[in-house]
Regions:
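Helix-loop boundary and gating motifs at the non-cytosolic
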Residues: 1-24
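Loop-to-transmembrane helix entry/capping segments in MFS-fold secondary transporters
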Residues: 17, 98-113
Length: 179
């Protein structure tokens, strides 16, 4: 949740105006990642696609922590791919792994967690972290983004150690009902 509210502030602090235009660069890589996702799904397990998205997120925040224009813009470019590989893969996971009778509820819960409670807690947490990294109107961007990168790295390690899934990416299409 730290990307959307604080990247524009960091862009301005680096002398880059028109934050919306710079932020839209992430949409380009998001679209590319969506096209690539189909190929990844037949070659990689969902675990590794999700882990790749989390890894891109760690790198995105680490690059932003460099406090340079190039680092921040590269981080923005990585955001689109990270977003797709994490959030879209999570939706695919629910679609593939949850019993059809429960799938609608599971997708609704995923939306509530991602767009509701998760977003709210993320914004509150990053807001508190931002306040801790800001003194006298000056933000210590390396500390801010570095902290988010470390937190995301911890999530990545937890995910890699705890996730147990199937040995294949997508499950085969269900057989048509017998007539």
């Amino acid at each position: 949740a730290g990307f959307y509210p604080y990247t524009p502030l960091h862009l301005r602090s680096l002398g880059l105006e028109h934050a919306s235009a710079w932020m839209s660069l992430g949409q380009i890589t998001e679209i590319i990642a969506m096209f690539a996702l189909g190929g990844l799904l037949v070659r990689w397990r969902l675990k590794w696609i999700f882990a790749a998205g989390l890894t891109l997120g760690v790198v995105r925040f680490a690059l932003s922590a460099l406090d340079t224009r190039a680092g921040l813009i590269t981080g923005i470019l990585l955001h689109g791919a990270s977003f797709t590989l994490v959030l879209i893969t999570a939706q695919i996971y629910v679609d593939q792994r949850v019993d059809p009778a429960w799938r609608g509820r599971a997708q609704a819960l995923l939306s509530l967690v991602n767009g509701g409670f998760g977003n709210m807690l993320g914004y509150l947490g990053t807001g508190g972290w931002f306040a801790l990294c800001t003194a006298s109107g000056t933000t210590r961007w390396p500390a801010f983004w570095g902290g988010l990168s470390a937190a995301m790295a911890a999530v990545l390690v937890f995910f890699l150690l705890s996730y147990r899934g199937r040995s294949t990416g997508l499950s085969p299409a269900p057989a048509p009902p017998a007539s």
